[in-house]
């Protein structure tokens, strides 16, 4: 809707009056219990729409490190070099291991 320079104030006041009348008409029809139910419904919708932050599970991180520890222990039992490894990111399902100057890249199976 375009507002012309000469009539912008009168149109705005008319729109304001119309919106106030509409709000008054709607609220006058509703009873207190209707308003309470409406507020309760809006609160429920709001709480459902808010995305809960995902909790970082300590068990998930621990199991990831343990599985890589098993890989390193197996390599030591089979005569491999003892590994001093660092887990970069468990979500990648891989681990970067470093021992001295040697570097190893393990893929989780």
Curated annotation (Swiss-Prot):
It comes from the Eukaryota. The chain crosses the membrane at residues 26-48. It is a single-pass membrane protein. Keywords: Membrane, Transmembrane, Transmembrane helix. GO terms for cellular component: membrane. It is found in: Membrane. Its main location: membrane. Partially overlaps ISU2. This is Putative uncharacterized protein YOR225W. It comes from Saccharomyces cerevisiae (strain ATCC 204508 / S288c).
């Amino acid at each position: 809707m375009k507002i012309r320079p000469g009539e912008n104030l009168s149109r705005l006041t008319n729109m304001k009056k119309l919106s106030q009348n509409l709000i008054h008409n709607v609220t006058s029809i509703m009873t207190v219990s209707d308003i309470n139910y409406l507020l309760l419904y809006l609160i429920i919708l709001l709480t459902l729409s808010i995305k809960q932050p995902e909790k970082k599970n300590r068990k998930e991180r621990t199991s990831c490190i343990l599985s890589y520890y098993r890989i390193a222990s197996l390599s030591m039992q089979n005569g491999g070099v003892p590994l001093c490894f660092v887990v970069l990111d468990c979500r990648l399902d891989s681990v970067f291991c470093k021992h001295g100057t040697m570097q190893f890249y393990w893929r989780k199976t």
